[in-house]
Curated annotation (Swiss-Prot):
This is Histidinol dehydrogenase. HAMAP family: HisD. One of its GO terms (biological process) is L-histidine biosynthetic process. Pathway: Amino-acid biosynthesis; L-histidine biosynthesis; L-histidine from 5-phospho-alpha-D-ribose 1-diphosphate: step 9/9. The keyword Transmembrane does not apply. It comes from Pelagibacter ubique (strain HTCC1062). Transmembrane segments: none annotated.
Amino acid sequence: MIKILDSKNKNFDKTLDALLSKRKNKVQLNSVSVIKIIKDVKKNGDKAILKYEKRFNKNSIIAPSIKQINRAIQSLDQKVKKAIDLAYDRIYKFHSLQKFKNISYTDKLKNKLEYKYVPIESVAIYVPGSTASYPSSVLMNAVPAIVAGVKRLVMVNPGQKGKQNPAVLYAAKKCKIKEIYSIGGPSAIAAVAYGTKKIKKVDKIIGPGNSYVAAAKKEVFGDVGIEGMIAGPSEVTIVCDKFSNPEWIASDLIGQAEHDNLAQCILISKDKSIIKKVNYEIINQLKELPRAVIAKNSLLNNGILIYMPSDQKIINTVNKIAPEHLELNTKNYKKVVSKIKNAGSICLGKYAVMAMTDYNVGSNHVLPTNSSARYSSGVSVNEFYKRISYINLSKKGIETLGPSVITLANYEGLVGHAKSVEKRIRRK
């Protein structure tokens, strides 16, 4: 069922590149239809949003009432509430350690330079909800924003026939989110990016979503901020060895595959027998999975089991894939981990299962996908800050440094720049 590759094959690199590119192309194919939706929402506002909500989500409600929200929350099991509370506390604790220090510096000329972190004023959090509900995504996006000091938090989350998941609503209440909209997809992204009569636009949009949502965020970027990476369909790469438990490894792969039909699950091992055992376990475990159809499609289309006898080749391949999630489920992971440069998050050892990081370990699960871990990072408190430089020059400072600036400005042909300095240091 799952594609099995041997790195010793002379066409291995080409085959792997083709498989990875094929999935990337699927993720990127949605841009044309997304642009049409965004233009429609910009032109027709709430009317366009309702049109797409009725078509895709069978929903005719843009914003649930406070009464509807409270009624839904009251129906939530206490165990789930406590689990959300625990996750909130742990995520808050870890992210509160990510505080950033303002810088203030005065030089010998009494010029004062400052660099300050200023919270973004308004942020919209996109929480997926078309095939499953994710209260954890509310926490992962909202808690760092709370730590940063964002004043206005907005949540967009596609409801099912206008009804949102009680756990998602409880998590939003826990995070003191007062603006909640039961909309999703590209139209929701356009709504918070450009605003409508019912929805006030925001300064930044963050949060994971399917390929359509990811494409929409890329399209609105520039008119509104987005996170420093695109959080698209989920990915995991697992490196295991003969000491790994094949039952555990299979369940980790399936756990990622059940997210989305475009989820990417890759296994790499130096041991052929573990690959066979994991493959067998996957077939058996899928029979017990409620979301087996999604997981099976994902594994069939984007799953890869790779035999790779060289440690260096494994390291190079992982850095090339640059996965969202990486599990180093090997005995020698300490020797390997320092050489891994491209991954959204790295789970070390047999107990650090990716599913734990999705919920209450404390680290963030909104991570770069589609190989963007080569140049970007997951959501952190830093995502919700702007950095502003403050400059206060003394008379002595401009008189001392100004002549050099005039020289450079004239050299670059920017005479106006040079003259604006000259006028301040000209002797009368």
